[in-house]
A protein has these predicted regions:
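Short, acidic, Ser/Thr-enriched surface-loop or helix-capping motifs
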Residues: 184
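Short Cys/His-rich "knuckle" micro-motifs
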Residues: 246-249
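Short linear motifs in exposed loops
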Residues: 32, 192-193
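Short, small/polar residue-rich loop motifs at catalytic or cofactor-binding pockets
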Residues: 174-177
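Conserved glycine-rich "GG(E/T)P / GGGxP" loop and the immediately following alpha-helix
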Residues: 1-140, 144
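C-terminal accessory region of radical SAM enzymes
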Residues: 100-107, 132-169, 194-244
Length: 252
């Protein structure tokens, strides 16, 4: 995506959304224009948020001068991808995270792997403690390590895939189209942050306004389906998040 394309898409979203999350599965730190995107988003009144696997933090010191409001680092990706040398990884993550937090960015170190690849969680927390000593303040979802610096834990869930079997859940729920949408690099609007392949295209921001797209028959059917706790789209029927989200407060 070019800077002009980003400018066009964010202009289309201005006044309609508040938060911009710079990922739809991809690794945002790979994009050379990420600092410019963040600064433009701030100028337009958006609140930018980045989720990253943290492997490129040491190479992107330029981001320290163009920090988002919030930086989420998925530590669980390290064990899930079978990477070596966790000490070096945590070293690089913590060096960037502590500096970003001191500059006012909210940094969340995520361990979203309960019930899955979580064998290294204990050692990872110990490595973090070597670089940000305990005691930490316990929270409902993890710990506060210092001002603007947190560790957050959550259950692992299975990403949606049309090749998966349908979940046999009597009730499902999702925040798609309630408090989130996704926009792919080509302008395609999808219902949520998990539809990275564009399996549920609702329209394109280069062709239509967001309000026109959200009023489409496909979008309204999906929204009303989740209102009645039913997944109407094949991809949603194969999504681990909607299957486990009964533990969340259901919104009408």
């Amino acid at each position: 995506m070019t800077l002009d394309e980003f400018d066009t898409l964010t202009t289309r979203l201005a006044g309609e959304v508040r938060f911009l999350y710079f990922h739809l599965m991809g690794e945002p730190f790979l994009h050379p224009l990420l600092p410019e995107f963040i600064l433009m988003a701030r100028r337009k009144g958006f609140t930018p948020v980045i989720t990253t696997n943290g492997t490129l933090l040491a190479q992107r010191g330029d981001l320290l001068d163009a920090l988002p409001h919030k930086l989420q680092i998925s530590l669980h990706s390290h064990e899930g991808n079978g990477k070596d040398n966790p000490e070096q990884y945590i070293d690089e993550v913590m060096a960037f995270a502590k500096e970003a937090a001191q500059r006012g960015c909210v940094v969340v170190l995520r361990l979203w792997n309960e019930g899955g690849f979580n064998r290294m969680n204990g050692p990872i927390l110990d490595m973090i403690a070597d670089r940000q000593p305990r005691p930490w303040t316990q929270r409902y979802d993890g710990w506060k390590l210092a001002e603007n610096l947190y560790v957050e834990s959550d259950d692992m869930f299975e990403w949606p895939d049309l090749q998966h079997d349908v979940y046999k859940e009597e009730e499902v729920f999702c925040y798609a189209l309630r408090n989130q949408i996704g926009v792919l690099a080509d302008g395609t609007v999808v219902p949520c942050c998990l539809d990275h392949n564009g399996d549920m295209p609702l329209g394109n921001l280069y062709d239509n306004s967001l309000n026109e797209i959200l009023a489409s028959p496909c979008a309204t059917a999906l929204y009303h389906g989740f209102t009645s706790h039913t997944a109407v789209e094949p991809l949603c029927q194969r999504c681990g998040y909607s299957a486990i989200s009964k533990r969340f407060r259901k919104q009408e």
